[in-house]
Amino acid sequence: EFADYSARRHVVDCKGAARVAALLDGKLTITIATSEHGWLRGSVDSLCEKLRKEGHLVLLVYKAEDIPPSDVLFLLSFWNLISSDILNQNIHNLVVHESDLPKGKGWSPLTWQVIDGESEIPITLFEAVEKVDAGAIYMRGKILLGEGDLIDEIRQKQAEKTYDLCE
């Protein structure tokens, strides 16, 4: 059962869910929202399982209306904008975006960089706020693409780095 922790506001300081857990007594209620038919659908269960093994209560949802109040809401390849009511019900609302924010705001940043011939793709973990791609930045990383990488290899690397930032 997810509880309402709206009074417990803390700041993530560059360690994803692990740092938030330390701040919030070790056990978190975590919701992961992803698009039901999106590219992460085939692998997101592995992130859920890893977080559960660490003692967290984890719920995977595909629709904004199914998001309960949580300590941490991860919005991972979630194709819908989230209302302020939903954002305000969670302690943290975290997004992983494949650009060097604030540069590269908008949809499908990895795709545009691949089209532009980039092989080193920046990736950013940040706090979701009402304005798109505008929240506080907590972590940055890079996805390194090989010359012959096809979409399956690119998505695998993207998923691995996304999950690393969330753990």
Feature roles, as predicted:
Residues F2-E167:
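One-carbon transfer enzymes
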